[in-house]
């Protein structure tokens, strides 16, 4: 399963990319608004840092506006994936852009029907928002399983399932068990995935024991 980082924060992107963890980036207008500076500079820098796909979202809501904006966003790099909303105009823009070789990520997906229609329109990625479904008392992971089952029936659909609105590490585990193609994570969730109390305790014990060895063998070097 590929791991994308859901952020526009350059420091976080560089941090996790240096660990070799990132296969791509997803952004949206809300994430861009949290960062200082010119969003154009940030988008250009992100596409240079990350070799994998970088989803940049349109802010237009009509068909022609989304297509025009999508083409401009694509100019930031060959790894740019244009992100459009799951609306009638969004699907129309998806079909238009994908037919010109511009990959599209259809976002704000909350049902299997929407995912199927996005795939039919030519989307490279479909982004189901699981956390927001959990927030209203539904099980977001059931949606991922339903989409996975549907896509499995139709191998000609090459659309990848990009699990979004991830709230905690267990969402990642569940997505991986189902077989989702991609999960996009806030930096805080990826930080939590790196940590376990027993890892910390084990490392501390190893170092304490090694200090004893060094005390008994002051000339030892490794």
UniProtKB/Swiss-Prot annotation:
One of its GO terms (biological process) is carbohydrate metabolic process. GO terms for molecular function: aldehyde-lyase activity; transaldolase activity. The active site is at 83 (schiff-base intermediate with substrate). PROSITE patterns: TRANSALDOLASE_1, TRANSALDOLASE_2. It comes from the Archaea. It is found in: Cytoplasm. Belongs to the transaldolase family. Type 3B subfamily. Transaldolase is important for the balance of metabolites in the pentose-phosphate pathway. This is Probable transaldolase. The gene is tal.
């Amino acid at each position: 399963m590929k791991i994308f980082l859901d952020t526009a924060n350059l420091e976080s992107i560089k941090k996790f990319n240096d660990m070799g963890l990132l296969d791509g980036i997803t952004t949206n207008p809300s994430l861009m608004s949290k960062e200082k500076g010119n969003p154009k500079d940030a988008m250009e820098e992100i596409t240079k840092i990350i070799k994998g796909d970088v989803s940049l979202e349109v802010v237009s809501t009509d068909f022609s506006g989304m297509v025009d904006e999508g083409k401009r966003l694509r100019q930031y790099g060959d790894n740019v994936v244009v992100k459009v909303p799951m609306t009638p105009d969004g699907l129309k823009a998806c079909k238009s852009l994908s037919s010109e070789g511009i990959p599209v990520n259809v976002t704000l997906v909350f049902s299997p029907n929407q995912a199927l229609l996005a795939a039919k329109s030519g989307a490279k990625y479909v982004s189901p928002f699981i956390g927001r479904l959990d927030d209203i008392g539904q099980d977001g992971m059931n949606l991922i399983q339903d989409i996975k089952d549907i896509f499995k029936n139709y191998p000609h659909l090459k659309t990848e399932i990009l699990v979004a609105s991830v709230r905690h590490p267990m969402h990642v585990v569940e997505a991986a068990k189902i077989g989702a193609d991609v999960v996009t994570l806030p930096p805080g969730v990826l930080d939590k995935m790196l940590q376990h109390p027993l890892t910390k305790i084990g490392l501390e014990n190893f170092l304490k024991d090694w200090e004893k060895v060094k005390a008994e063998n002051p000339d030892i070097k490794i």
